[in-house]
């Protein structure tokens, strides 16, 4: 398992996402008729996180105007924490992770925060056909619901909300 290098807290009084994978509808920028591939998990994750919170993610896409190219490589496109604070009142900060990952993520709802967490996509069912049980690739998710007792997690990743359970739950949290 790839250990979480970054765990980010998104704090706003009692921040919660109430959708489930069964009823979640992705933001229109992630519909099947889009003309670009999902290649920036960070940008895609913020689009869906803001959308799931009932916020319009389009203003946050202004960060695309700051993309730069040095003649060989493009800069990595991402929303800046200050922009998210100004646009939506969301506080984005990195936490010093000292508890096991599962305990850290479980503590979020009690503290009124969501976490972005870097995990190994080997354990993410939504990556079937690419990395799921095939390749160890770092990616970022936002756990929305975690239930240790039934080994279940709902999470935002790329262009939607998904569910993992059982052995995948154990694997993503390093319980195996």
Question: Where are the predicted features?
Answer:
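Divalent-cation
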Residues: 93-106, 111, 122-134
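Catalytic nucleophile-His microenvironment captured as a short glycine-rich beta-strand/loop
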Residues: 131-157
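Noncatalytic regulatory segments and standalone regulatory/sensor domains
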Residues: 147-176
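Cysteine-nucleophile protease catalytic domains, especially the papain-like/related folds used
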Residues: 2-103
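Glycine-rich loops and low-complexity Gly/Arg-rich segments
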Residues: 120, 140-144, 167-170
């Amino acid at each position: 398992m790839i250990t979480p290098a970054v765990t980010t807290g998104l704090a706003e009084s009692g921040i919660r996402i109430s959708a489930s994978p069964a009823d979640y509808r992705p933001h229109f920028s992630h519909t099947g008729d889009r003309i670009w591939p999902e290649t920036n998990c960070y940008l895609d994750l913020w689009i869906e996180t803001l959308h799931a919170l009932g916020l319009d993610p389009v203003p946050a896409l202004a960060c695309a105007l700051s993309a730069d190219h040095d003649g060989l490589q493009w800069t990595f496109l991402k929303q800046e924490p200050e922009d998210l604070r100004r646009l939506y009142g969301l506080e984005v900060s990195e936490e010093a992770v000292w508890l096991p990952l599962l305990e850290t993520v479980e503590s979020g709802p009690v503290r009124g925060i969501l976490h972005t967490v870097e995990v190994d996509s080997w354990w993410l069912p939504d990556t079937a056909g690419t990395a799921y049980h095939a390749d160890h690739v770092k990616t970022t998710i936002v756990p929305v619901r975690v239930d240790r007792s039934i080994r279940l997690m709902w999470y935002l990743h790329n262009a939607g909300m998904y569910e993992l359970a059982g052995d995948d739950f154990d694997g993503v949290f390093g319980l195996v």
